Amino acid sequence: GGGRTGEWTPGIGYDGGSGGGAPGNPTGQPIPSFGQATQPQQPGDSGSYGFGNPGGYGVHTTNDGGGGGGGGAGTAGQGISGHSYPQTSSAAGTPGGNGGAGKQYDISGSQVYYAGGGGGGGGGSDNPLWSITGGQGGQGGGGFGGASARSPHAVTNAYHGHDGVANRGGGGGGGDNSNGGSGGSGIVIVKY
């Protein structure tokens, strides 16, 4: 699942294989929901199948609030500071939540994580005192969330979400009032 942006416009996290994180939004607006997994783990004829998890909550704040992280194949996305419920804050910007972890497989000959969730975008501004980082991508190729434009860790276009890692199937990171990253390409495994 992809991370969500920190923003002033109400929105929701979208459903997917794993759900997207909820956006951060100002107090006085309805608390936005995170996305749900459309293929959660469930029993089947030969064991369980499906590995989706929901996204995390964004921050409900009087200033710019960070978005929640997207769900990964292994764990749900996180809200701010790892909380799984809406947080309120009066701080001058809040970081994004981390993406959920993916699942580990040894199909390549070594243990590798796949399908991590994207990190949520940080909620900040151009004010240098509001230097806010995006959430970390989940283990398994999730993209990092975008930081505020003047974060001390910022590079050009740092407020954009980062793409998921190629061939890992991770979600893209959310932006800081900007574009989110693209999900990383997956892999095809042929057993013979």
Q: Where are the regions that the model predicts?
A:
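Low-complexity, glycine/proline-biased repetitive segments and flexible coils/loops
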Residues: 1-192
